[in-house]
Every structure is written in structure tokens, then in C-alpha cells.
Curated annotation (Swiss-Prot):
Name the record gives this protein: Phosphoglycerate kinase, cytosolic
A GO cellular component annotation in the UniProt record: cytosol
Pathway: Carbohydrate degradation; glycolysis; pyruvate from D-glyceraldehyde 3-phosphate: step 2/5
Residues reported to bind ADP: 200, 224, 327
Subunit (UniProt): Monomer.
Sites where the protein binds CDP: 200, 224, 322, 327
Enzyme class: transferase
Length: 401
């Protein structure tokens, strides 16, 4: 994918007095009283917005929240305004809509360095359909476009892709730039030895990532529920562990492909098993080949943690996507937490450590080690598609550097 123009390349002359349409990702979790339970995504958007404010732009922010079907008050962006205002140090105004006369009036009133937040763009079905007329209406509000919403870059929506056709320059924000530098850079020309750790419950959702990474990595470590499909493919009994029966041949072919490519593919040698899927289940550690009937594997075992740790000690670049076990249950969180601690330790020794979105981000935050990693990706699906080597519509639409 070509290198894209970044907002950092735009100077005062390009920005002062200009109306800038910024697509951010403010899709944060809210509790039943509409309090923000995790403001990571809002904080991640701040550097780009502040840069535009400091250079005298009139800033127009657009985002989605959740998956509303039409106008749904519980998905309004209004609860985000106090936190956003606090982080930016200005009073952010919010519109009741994202297009139309009222919005145009509010845009005209934004002072230099001021910020207007549009209401949830997904209140219009035209947003997800990427309808040109809707994209044109959004674009008509501004002079130039900045996309800083990496988390939705894999979607060709009106505010992520359509708008870029009608506004020039169309550039990447700082967050988008950092995501691309790390994720594209790591996959295109990593410092070797390069290891990937892939976890999660299903092989099916990670096939593309595993196949793509097998072309690039020296070491591939597998954990999470997907390992039982690999064990069964090797003829092991897996008790009542999660298995995708229709993916057994695929698991075999991935192991063969790794061998042919000289990739060291490591599966856990032992697992923590449970007599039921629950936080208070009885548990014990057994070798991977000896899971008894009626028991299910819910985490990687202590030997696996040791051998994974040793394999990672020799690396220069590590990408991690997906937990090693059911880390939501403390009893089955040791594997995931051990990997997080190992990566934090390696970061301290100069290894590039990239947490590739999704549940692994939550896991790293749970153990309080987020700050220690080289890069934590904010995109779930977008990170996966990028690691699979797929082009992202929201990135392709931006100007080349």
C-alpha cells in the first residue's frame, strides 16, 4: 500500500481559517447511565484535533457510535461532549444532526481553533451504504478532509471513504499514520527474527491472518480456543474443548505450510482444563495429548508459557493478536497475562512489540502494561485486514505522499 499524506505535512498556510472535516473513531463503550467506561479512543483522537486547533482551523468532527438502525437516542454522541471538551481544553459544541441547514449554521459559527461535533453519522443509512449524495453533503461542510478513524478504515462508508472524493487534500491523521507505520511497516519489512502470536477462539476468523503471516514470520505461536482444532487434526483426543470440525484439513495444511516455509510453528505442550465453562470450574493442568472426556481446555499451561517465552526471547519484532485463554475468568487468565508480561519485558530490551487490536488490547490493559508496548492498535477488524495484507478503503481514498 502506498505511503499516504499525513496531517503533519500540512502547515499553517494550509490550515488557518480552513474548515476541516475530521473523521474520528469515538465509538466508546457507555454504561446504562451513559457514562464512558473506557475513553481510550477519545484520547487517541486528541493529537490530531489539537494540531488543527493550534493551526487555526475550524474543526468539524464526525464519528459513529454503535450500530444504530436510524436515529436512536441511546447512540447519540452527546454523552461524549464533556470528556472531549475536557481533553481538548475548549467547549466542544454538538449538532443535533450531521447534515442540513442547522449544521451549516453551526459550522459557520465555529471560531478559529474551535470544535463542532456532528451527531452520529450512522443515524443515516446512507453512511454505511456510502451513498455519493450523502458523502457530498458531508463534504460540502468543509474545505479539506482528515481521516483519523483507523478502526473503521476497513469499511467503505460515506464519512470514511466517500467524502475523500470531494475534498482535497484528503490526509491521514496522526493516529491513522502511526497505525499504518507500525502495522504495514512490521509486516512489510520487520526487524528479524519476527514472531507472531495468534490466539482467539476460532481458527475460521484468523485463517487469513495466519496464512498471510506464514509468508513473513520466523516463529508462529498459537493459543486460545483455536488450538484444539489443530490438536484434533493431529489425532489427539480433545474432550469437550471447542473444535471446528470443518477446519481439520485446513489446520493440517497450515502446519504443513509452516514446515515447508521453515517457520517454527509452536502449539502449547500443555493446557489448563476445566470440567465446565465457568469462572468457578474445577481445573487442572494436563499434557496437550491427554485431555480426558468431559473436560475442556480453557488456557495454555505452565510448560507452554515457558517454551513460548523462550521462543520470544530471540526475537526483534512481535505481533500479538488474540488471547491465549478465557482471560475473563481469573482462573484461566495466566497464559494471556504471561504473554503480556513477556512482551512488556521484551519492549524494555528494544524489541518492537505490536498489539494487533481486539481482545489482546483488553488483556494488556487488564494487567496494566499497555504503556510498555511499542504500539497498541485501536482497530479490531481493520488491524486484522491489514495484517492479512488486504487494502483498506479508508486508507486508499487518501492522497499519496
Amino acid at each position: 500500500m502506498a505511503v499516504k499524506k499525513s496531517v503533519g505535512s500540512l502547515k499553517e498556510a494550509d490550515l488557518k481559517g480552513k474548515r476541516v472535516f475530521v473523521r474520528v473513531d469515538l465509538n466508546v463503550p457507555l454504561d446504562e447511565n451513559f457514562n464512558i467506561t473506557d475513553d481510550t479512543r477519545i484520547r487517541a483522537a486528541v493529537p490530531t484535533i489539537k494540531y488543527l486547533m493550534q493551526h487555526g482551523s475550524h474543526v468539524i468532527l464526525a464519528s459513529h457510535l454503535g450500530r444504530p438502525k436510524g436515529v436512536t437516542p441511546k447512540y447519540s454522541l452527546k454523552p461524549l461532549v464533556p470528556r472531549l471538551s475536557e481533553l481538548l481544553g475548549v467547549e466542544v459544541k454538538i449538532a443535533n444532526d450531521s447534515i442540513g441547514p442547522e449544521v451549516e449554521k453551526l459550522v459557520a459559527e465555529i471560531p478559529e481553533g474551535g470544535v463542532l461535533l456532528l451527531e452520529n453519522v450512522r443515524f443515516y443509512k446512507e453512511e454505511e451504504k456510502n451513498e455519493p449524495e450523502f458523502a457530498k453533503k458531508l463534504a460540502s461542510l468543509a474545505d479539506l478532509y482528515v481521516n483519523d478513524a483507523f478502526g473503521t478504515a476497513h469499511r467503505a462508508h460515506a464519512s470514511t471513504e466517500g467524502v475523500a472524493k470531494y475534498l482535497k487534500p484528503a490526509v491521514a491523521g496522526f493516529l491513522m499514520q502511526k497505525e499504518l507505520d507500525y502495522l504495514v511497516g512490521a509486516v512489510a519489512n520487520p526487524q528479524k527474527p519476527f514472531a507472531a502470536i495468534v490466539g482467539g477462539s476460532k481458527v475460521s476468523s484468523k485463517i487469513g491472518v495466519i496464512e498471510s503471516l506464514l509468508e513473513k514470520v520466523d516463529v508462529l505461536l498459537l493459543g486460545g480456543g483455536m488450538i484444539f482444532t489443530f490438536y484434533k487434526a493431529q489425532g489427539y483426543a480433545v474432550g469437550s474443548s471447542l473444535v471446528e470440525e470443518d477446519k481439520l484439513d485446513l489446520a493440517t495444511s497450515l502446519m504443513e505450510k509452516a514446515k515447508a516455509k521453515g517457520v517454527s510453528l509452536l502449539l502449547p505442550t500443555d493446557v489448563v482444563i476445566a470440567d465446565k465453562f465457568a469462572a468457578d470450574a474445577n481445573s487442572k493442568v494436563v499434557p496437550a495429548s491427554e485431555i480426558p472426556d468431559g473436560w475442556m481446555g480453557l488456557d495454555i499451561g505452565p510448560d507452554a508459557i515457558k517454551s513460548f517465552g523462550s521462543a520470544l526471547d530471540t526475537t526483534k519484532t512481535v505481533i500479538w493478536n488474540g488471547p491465549m485463554g478465557v482471560f475473563e475468568f481469573d482462573k484461566f487468565a495466566a497464559g494471556t497475562e504471561a504473554i503480556a508480561k513477556k512482551l512488556a519485558e521484551l519492549s524494555g530490551k528494544g524489541v518492537t512489540t505490536i498489539i494487533g487490536g481486539g481482545d489482546s488490547v483488553a488483556a494488556v490493559e487488564k494487567v496494566g502494561l499497555a504503556e510498555k508496548m511499542s504500539h497498541i492498535s485501536t482497530g479490531g477488524g481493520a488491524s486484522l485486514e491489514l495484517l492479512e495484507g488486504k487494502p483498506l478503503p479508508g486508507v486508499l481514498a487518501l492522497d499519496d505522499a
